[in-house]
């Protein structure tokens, strides 16, 4: 499992290559990603966050072992080789337990790390940047690094215990603002300064030395920084290379290190490519993929309404709206404004809080009903042209079957293709 260290080695040798990380637990998104990687014969990096998946189940109800089993079963069913599959854990640390005292939160974080590593996750993002209940705000670099080193030691010991060797690859540091898209309206974003990046690295190097972990430094492959990319509900802050030039040059002094960029969703293909060239060579993408899934489902729901009598329709959009109103906990602290603004955000926001609702049984039943309704007879081509014009071109050329499932998968793969192209290198 040396895909990542080899990618970093090639990048440092001037190949301008990278890798994208699929950050989603949705079965259709994962199927789209696995099939795309298979068709292009590339490794595939799939990541779970500490919110989605933890030793208690996270919001998906899955432990790390469950998530691995789910992904591997899907990969097997699609004949994707498991040695080309890399599993990563994102923002692993006390993130979920910030409301607890630090001692308790870090004990939970120890167990979180053990559960991820024991399940076979090989890319581990150590993030202890968040203050716990009895911590100062913000934490110093030294405290953050000491906690990360403690978790690295747990990870190394767990890996040796379960696999007989320590072959983990680490990412350190964090971006600002919080994971998953900004809550507020944005206009500009501060880029991480070279001094701040250096301070994070040196604090971690020192803390790792104190834990007797000098030997793992070459396996710390990336530092998470903010290159100046973010999105809110209706806007995207595009990458501006000039603003990140000093940061980009700084990492050239570290022979085994690149940058990892979070919240790259909705960047233009040109910006994604430039990020990789500028050494932000691990690109995280999540909401943009479930946003594409949602787009495809809304388009198919519109087609269904044209073809199927109202009483026989799935009513997917109304079911979705009803469930989101009944259980507002995943969106109400993110979406603001009057009733109409919040309604629009629930359906269309770039932050895509709707992604938390797809596993709901009522919504899943409506989705299955929609697919059944449209699978009974061929979807008329003019309706595909109207509602899924990019897929229509591929249907007409014979490269895409016009079934509901294939149209959804292909629409998601259009986003993956942008990331693949950005990461290919010279």
UniProtKB/Swiss-Prot annotation:
NCBIfam families: agaZ_gatZ, PRK15458.1. Belongs to the GatZ/KbaZ family. KbaZ subfamily. This is D-tagatose-1,6-bisphosphate aldolase subunit KbaZ. Component of the tagatose-1,6-bisphosphate aldolase KbaYZ that is required for full activity and stability of the Y subunit. Could have a chaperone-like function for the proper and stable folding of KbaY. When expressed alone, KbaZ does not show any aldolase activity. Pathway: Carbohydrate metabolism; D-tagatose 6-phosphate degradation; D-glyceraldehyde 3-phosphate and glycerone phosphate from D-tagatose 6-phosphate: step 2/2. GO terms for biological process: carbohydrate metabolic process; D-tagatose 6-phosphate catabolic process; phosphoenolpyruvate-dependent sugar phosphotransferase system. PANTHER family: D-TAGATOSE-1,6-BISPHOSPHATE ALDOLASE SUBUNIT KBAZ, N-ACETYLGALACTOSAMINE PERMEASE II COMPONENT-RELATED. Forms a complex with KbaY. InterPro entries: Aldolase_TIM (IPR013785), GatZ/KbaZ-like (IPR012062), GatZ_KbaZ_carbometab (IPR050303), TagBP_ald_KbaZ (IPR023435). GO terms for cellular component: plasma membrane. It holds the Pfam family GatZ_KbaZ-like.
């Amino acid at each position: 499992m040396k895909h990542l260290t080899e990618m970093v080695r090639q990048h440092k040798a001037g190949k301008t290559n990278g890798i994208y990380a699929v950050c989603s637990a949705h079965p259709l998104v994962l199927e789209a990603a696995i099939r795309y990687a298979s068709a292009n014969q590339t490794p595939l990096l799939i990541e779970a966050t500490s919110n989605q998946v933890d030793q208690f189940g996270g919001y998906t109800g899955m432990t790390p072992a469950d998530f691995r089993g789910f992904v591997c079963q899907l990969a097997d069913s699609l004949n994707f080789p498991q040695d080309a599959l890399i599993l990563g854990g994102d923002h692993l640390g006390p993130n979920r337990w910030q409301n607890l005292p630090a001692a308790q939160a870090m004990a939970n974080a120890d167990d979180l790390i053990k559960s991820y590593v024991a399940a076979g996750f090989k890319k581990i993002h150590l993030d202890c940047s968040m203050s716990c209940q009895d911590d100062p705000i913000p934490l110093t670099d030294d405290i953050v690094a000491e906690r990360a080193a403690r978790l690295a030691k747990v990870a190394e010991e767990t890996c040796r215990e379960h696999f007989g060797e320590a072959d983990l690859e680490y990412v350190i540091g964090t971006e600002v603002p919080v994971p998953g898209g900004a809550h507020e309206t944005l206009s500009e974003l501060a880029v991480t300064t070279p001094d701040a990046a250096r301070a994070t690295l040196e604090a971690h190097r020192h803390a790792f030395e104190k834990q007797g972990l000098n030997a793992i430094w070459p396996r710390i492959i990336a530092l998470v920084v903010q290159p100046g990319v973010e999105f809110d509900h209706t806007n995207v802050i595009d990458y501006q290379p000039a603003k990140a030039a000093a940061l980009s040059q700084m990492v050239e002094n570290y022979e085994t290190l690149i940058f990892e960029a979070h919240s790259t969703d909705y960047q233009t293909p040109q910006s994604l490519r430039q990020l990789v060239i500028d050494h932000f060579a691990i690109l995280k993408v999540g909401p943009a993929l479930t946003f594409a899934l949602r787009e495809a489902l809304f388009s198919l729901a519109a087609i269904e309404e044209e073809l199927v009598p109202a009483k026989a329709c799935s009513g997917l959009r109304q079911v979705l709206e009803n469930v989101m109103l009944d259980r507002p906990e995943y969106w109400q602290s993110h979406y603001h404004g009057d009733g109409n603004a919040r309604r629009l955000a629930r359906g269309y926001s770039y932050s895509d809080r709707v992604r938390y609702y797809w596993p709901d049984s009522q919504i899943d039943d409506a989705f299955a009903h929609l697919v059944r309704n449209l699978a009974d007879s061929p979807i008329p081509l003019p309706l595909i042209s109207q509602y899924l014009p990019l897929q229509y071109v591929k249907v007409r050329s014979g490269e895409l079957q016009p079934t509901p499932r294939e149209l959804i998968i292909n629409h998601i793969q259009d986003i993956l293709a942008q990331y693949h192209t950005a990461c290919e290198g010279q």
